[in-house]
Amino acid sequence: MTATPADRPDPGVAGDADWAAEARPLLVHADMRLCKRFDQGEPTERLLALRARAVDQLMRNAWARCIPADARLSLHAVGGYGRGELFPRSDVDLLVLGETAAQQRHEQALARLFALLWDVGLPISHAVRSPAQCTSAAADQTVLTALIESRPLVADAQARAALAAAIAPQQVWPPRAFFQAKREELHARHQRFGDTADNLEPDIKDGPGGLRDLQTLGWMALRAFGVKDLEALVGLGHVGMDEAAALRREREELARLRYGLHLVANRPEERLRFDYQKTLAERLGFADDPESLGVEKMMQRFYRSAALIRRISDRLLQRFEEQFDGEAVPVQLDAGFSLRRGYLTADADTWPDGDVVQVFALFAQWAAHREVRGLHSLTARALAEVLRDLPAYDVADAIARDRFMALLRGPRAVETLNRMARLGVLGQWIPAFASVSGRMQFDLFHVYTVDQHTLMVLRNIALFAAGRADERFSITHEVWPRLRKPELLLLAGLFHDIAKGRGGDHSELGAVDARAFCLAHRLSEGDTELVTWLVEQHLRMSVTAQKQDISDPEVIHRFATLVGTRERLDYLYLLTCADIAGTSPKLWNAWKDRLLADLYFAARRALREGLEHPPPREERLREARESARTLMQAQGHDDATIDRQFAGMPDENFLRFRPEQLAWQAASLIEVQIGQTLVKARRAVPDNDALEVFVYSPDRDGLFSAIVATLDRKGYGIHRARVLDAPHDAIFDVFEVLPQDSSADGDPQRLAAALRQVLAGDLLKVRPSRRAVPRQLRHFRFAPRVEFSESAGGRRTRISLVAPDRPGLLADVAHVLRMQHLRVHDARIATFGERAEDQFQITDEHDRPLPDAARQALRDALCACLDPT
């Protein structure tokens, strides 16, 4: 912007509108030119400076237009604008400096200035202060932070000196206090984001490893050492040239992301939301290929940048701390290692370049001494310098491999693996792990990057070992002690997803990697086979439990045959629990815990009794009745009452439910007469939100649909529904539900009362409620898929439905089934992020499987209901 309307004589306030009308397109055209240069790949750092310079000129011209030359006021850029970095949609922060009398004398002129700048289209944020007011306001360190980066726009030497004196360390916030405050602020900010950058929609600016971390280091350096950028600290010995270069490189990466994000969002957006990720990836040139989406590549680049920034930032913060506190007297540990102010140090004369054995010795020391706060900054830097020279396991010697296995078998093994991953050592030792580092999957199911998910799985395994997982995992503490070698489970967890992103079946490819690793580390053939099998089959137990009917003896027989041994079952069960719970904080719940435990016990029994002769149906019925009878007798019920209740329950009931469920159902039925309706609800697990709902009712058109719609309206998500025919034309409905949103209060009595009220009315008038699709789900739409097959020996039709998830989905499906006059006998509801994968066993109104014509009509109706377009 080399010429603005302000270059002409000021015609007064009356001409401001014309001036703004001419200045506005100049600013727009300047942004358009910068946008074009951005798309051509020009360094973002230069574009930010050019945009700030363009706004500078407009500011000076507007100031000259509105403020008299003798006003004794000065104009300063502060904050990011003061740094000379102005992103496309960022606020323009200004400080007007002058004594109170001058402020009051020119109050109208200042108001005119700010109005004019807003009319031009600049999102200004301004403060008008005297030097003394600056000192007072700077008692808030966030205000001081903005002021220490001030840059004069219209100010003489006297004004600049006055501002510098007002916020000098002698006046407010000496360097040590400022450092401590900023470090605490950084820690609190990280905690707001769960102390990880690996979120699905990370914050480029404020998240861990984001631009704000780099700015924080810069503010500390400016206050403590008086330098304008981190590169200047190289000469002072506080930052290495390699570290400064790495931070500059990663700053450019993040700045480019943020610049592009402002452009595609057309607002000051700082989060990489799903709304913008694909568009931004395309704009930045990240293209899809057979193995990865472009958006996944872009996000991986971001996650890796954030991780590196955090590693270097941790080192610099420690060095700044030492600058203020001085060197501490070392406390000697084992030969070659010591503690300095709680930080583990490898002595310089014992640190051999590229010696991975010595690196593993460092981590062994860390694991052996709980008092260690972390690595000393000099040791961490030395490790970073030799990192690329460390050999991978397949070219390292046997001693190094043995040392790694010793770490895996030693105390705090999972903590050690986490540290090795964070510092880049694990990816160097296992290159396949480096390949998945920072790799995200563009869906709502996997909320962590592959490497972070892997580490979450390992942490869950550590909880099993410590016995602290009992609240969430009902039987892991019973199974864990049976493990012959816990390190084999850790290896399976480490490799289970390591082949993601290569194309092909990641379970099979990962099994190949796991086998090679085990053989290289001299594991026995039996141990190698176990780890390989676990990696290859790590999804099998989850799929069986969630997508098949585990009350079906054929399902149990197939699964137990695949597993083959009790040892494999123990390892697979623990790996499955750790995997599901480590995929998303919301994925693991009481129903999944119970489902996997039921499958575990059923498979264990099948293995114990022999796979050749599974127990016949009559024997299973007898055992279930006897177990339920024992429980009811303990509750004070006599045999006559028990027999009467059992007679009113379908045989299928005794094959599908656990004894304690059968006892609860039978005891509940004592209250009801033939032809009446009963609704009961209870907590399935004490101190848990999971509820079990039992409905006994005469068979009525629309019963299932009305129950499902009511549960949905009350904010409950259905995880399983079973519908059984009972004597006297009655229906048994059993639902396993969990609160899904804030409208569900979790009270079983209130839920049962609400259902009774609905079932007492006209069921055909109950309609699914309509709710908006959440923002995140709107970005993962795909065409629904409906498939049919036979079930129950050809007596029923199975529908397998895959569709984009949304609120009220199941209620809509149930309504379609009712409108088609179909009966639901079983429903399995599974949600995997944005995907709903549901199965229903149905018949027509005469209890017959669906012919082809009826199937096609149902498919059309379901697709019309579920199609996101």
Curated annotation (Swiss-Prot):
Residues 692-771, 798-869 form the ACT domain. Its cofactor is Mg(2+). It catalyses: [protein-PII]-L-tyrosine + UTP = [protein-PII]-uridylyl-L-tyrosine + diphosphate; [protein-PII]-uridylyl-L-tyrosine + H2O = [protein-PII]-L-tyrosine + UMP + H(+). Disulfide bonds: none annotated. It comes from the Bacteria. InterPro entries: ACT-like_dom_sf (IPR045865), ACT_dom (IPR002912), HD/PDEase_dom (IPR003607), HD_domain (IPR006674), NT_sf (IPR043519), PII_UdlTrfase/GS_AdlTrfase (IPR013546), Polymerase_NTP_transf_dom (IPR002934), UTase/UR (IPR010043). It holds the Pfam family ACT. GO terms for biological process: regulation of nitrogen utilization. Residues 1-332 are annotated as: Uridylyltransferase. One of its GO terms (molecular function) is phosphoric diester hydrolase activity. Residues 450-572 form the HD domain. Keywords: Hydrolase, Magnesium, Multifunctional enzyme, Nucleotidyltransferase, Repeat, Transferase. Uridylyltransferase (UTase) activity is inhibited by glutamine, while glutamine activates uridylyl-removing (UR) activity. Modifies, by uridylylation and deuridylylation, the PII regulatory proteins (GlnB and homologs), in response to the nitrogen status of the cell that GlnD senses through the glutamine level. Under low glutamine levels, catalyzes the conversion of the PII proteins and UTP to PII-UMP and PPi, while under higher glutamine levels, GlnD hydrolyzes PII-UMP to PII and UMP (deuridylylation). Thus, controls uridylylation state and activity of the PII proteins, and plays an important role in the regulation of nitrogen assimilation and metabolism. Has four distinct domains: an N-terminal nucleotidyltransferase (NT) domain responsible for UTase activity, a central HD domain that encodes UR activity, and two C-terminal ACT domains that seem to have a role in glutamine sensing. Belongs to the GlnD family. This is Bifunctional uridylyltransferase/uridylyl-removing enzyme. It comes from Xanthomonas campestris pv. campestris (strain B100).
